[in-house]
Amino acid sequence: MVGMDSLEIRKRFLDFFATLGHTVVPSSSLIPDDPSVLLTTAGMQQFKAYYTGRADPIMDFGSRNTASIQKSFRTSDIDEVGDESHLTFFEMLGNFSFGGYFKEEAIRCAYDFFKEMGLEIEYATVFEGERE
C-alpha cells in the first residue's frame, strides 16, 4: 500500500466489494432526507429505511448488500478537532448488508480486504458489554 493515494484506496475498496456482489451506491447528501437528524453523520444513515424494513434492498439495489463512500459531518466532538485524529468532515467507507450476511461474514470481508491491500492485522479486540 506504500504510495497509494486516497483515490486508489477508494477505488480498490469499491471494486473489492463489487466483486463480492455488493451494489456500489453513491454518497447521499450531507443534508439528509430524514427529519430526525440535521446532518449525515455516518455511512449507514442513508440506509436507515432498509435496516428498519421500510424499504426493500432487492427492489432498490438488486442486492441485499451494498458498499459506499459516504460524506459525513460530525459536531459531537467538535472540541477535539485539531488533535490530528478528530475531524468534522470525512468520508466513511462502508459495506452494508440487509439480511444477506451478519457479523462473521462482515469480519471475514474486512479481513480479506485488508489482506488484499497488503496490510497485516496483528490482533483484534472485542467489546463484550457495557462498561458500567
Identify the function of each model-found stretch.
Residues V2-E132:
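Structured aminoacyl-transfer and RNA-binding surfaces used for tRNA recognition/handling
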